[in-house]
Regions:
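C-terminal segment of classical bacterial N-terminal signal peptides
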Residues: 1-8
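Short, basic/aromatic beta-hairpin or loop at an interaction surface
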Residues: 10-25, 66-84, 167-181
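Alpha/propeptide regions of enzymes that mature by internal proteolysis
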Residues: 12-14, 18-24, 32-46, 51, ...
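Short, Lys/Arg- and Gly-enriched loop/turn segments at beta-strand edges
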Residues: 52-65, 111-121, 209-219, 308-311
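Extended, compositionally biased flexible segments
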Residues: 52-53, 57-96, 102, 108
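Intrinsically disordered, low-complexity linker/loop segments enriched in Gly/Pro
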Residues: 87-88, 94, 109-196
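Conserved mixed alpha/beta catalytic, RNA-binding, or beta-rich assembly cores of soluble enzyme
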Residues: 162-270
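Long, compositionally biased
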Residues: 313-335
Length: 335
């Protein structure tokens, strides 16, 4: 990171953004959505998100009424401007200086559990193999914040790695209101379980201010998210936003403290996987100055090509490449 960006980050303010009927975007990404918060590049937002469900569904699955969050009741009762998707998102956040063609760097500084439960559910016509499960089922799953596990069943504990399934910016204005379910060039419902605290997401900007939305909190998830939900819950995140004029992307990209991540998105999973590989090759050629031939070979011998999700209409694939591969090259250059 350039020195000017480090100084900017150190001096940046922190904002608090609650989830209320006035700050909720139910089921869409839209360049015409009015901002609920305006911030400067380099500033941080502690943003609250809600479980994507309704009190009736949660109570129907056995959750005591007293454990339903009051904000969820308020939003379900008062938000009428909703759809076409079903996710309850917080936003959008307007980042000053962001313009189409830029990249919005989102540093995920912290992701915290907000409630002591999650749910998992599948429907009669959703998920990856609905032909095998022609009915709907929903389960409330206790979360143990101290042990950071979900008590899935007696004797079955799932480690928690909280992340936001949906983080994105406004799509191009010509796209109008976009369904929150399929991911796209704007990011959105990526459902990438690597985007935990300490990771950074890079999103191509399509509208003034970027207009960032976030939600679909997961306490954990498996790659593929095969029944259409993970450990769905409410989360609080601390996110820092930096406008990058020096980067230009066509698809979202990410990195963790130990790895680089490229992404591919397409209704055809094979084509999504091809794009993930092409994006990593482009990254290696541009940022690591490898030839395309060498980049392709490195992806094959050291890159892990994974399925992100197969249930959101637009399928997702991603490639992970360890940063440690480049340690010796850095030392030779004196970096």
């Amino acid at each position: 990171m350039a020195l000017s960006l480090r100084v900017q980050a150190q001096k940046a303010a922190t904002h608090e953004l609650a989830i209320t009927p006035a700050t909720a975007a139910w089921g869409y990404y839209d360049a015409a959505a009015p901002p609920v918060l305006r911030i400067k590049s380099g500033e941080t937002v502690r943003v609250h998100t809600l479980i994507t469900s309704t009190p009736a569904r949660l109570e129907g699955a056995g959750l005591p009424a007293a454990q339903v969050e009051p904000n969820l009741r308020d939003i379900v009762e008062h938000v009428t401007n909703k759809g076409p998707g079903g996710h309850i998102l917080t936003g959008p956040i307007f980042v000053e200086g962001a313009e189409p063609g830029d990249v919005l760097e989102v540093r995920i500084q912290a992701v915290e559990l907000a409630i002591p439960y999650a749910y998992n559910a599948f429907g009669a016509k959703s998920g990856f193999i609905p032909e095998d499960f022609g009915y709907a089922k929903m389960r409330i799953i206790p979360l143990d914040k101290k042990k950071m596990v979900a008590h899935f069943l007696p004797g079955v504990e799932v480690p928690l790695r909280p992340f936001f399934g949906s983080m994105g910016v406004a799509p191009p204005a010509a796209s109008g209101r976009v369904n929150s379910a399929p991911p796209g060039i704007h990011g959105g419902n990526l459902d990438n379980k690597e985007l935990v605290a300490g990771s950074t997401l890079y999103l191509p900007v399509h509208a003034a201010g970027a207009l960032f939305f976030v939600g679909d909190g997961h306490a954990g998830q498996g790659n593929g998210e095969v029944d259409i939900t993970g450990l769905e819950t409410s989360l609080t995140g601390t996110l820092q936003f930096i406008v990058r004029k020096d980067m230009h992307l066509t698809l979202p990209r990410a990195e963790t403290p130990t790895a680089y991540i490229s992404m591919g998105l397409n209704e055809d999973l094979t084509l999504a996987a091809k794009d993930a590989v092409r994006e990593m090759i482009a990254f290696l050629a541009t940022e690591k100055h490898l030839s395309r031939d060498d980049a392709y070979m490195l992806c094959s011998v050291a890159g892990d090509l994974d399925v992100t999700q197969v249930v959101d209409g637009t399928r997702g694939a991603h490639m992970i490449l360890a940063k440690s591969l480049f340690g010796k090259a850095k030392k030779q250059k004196g970096n």
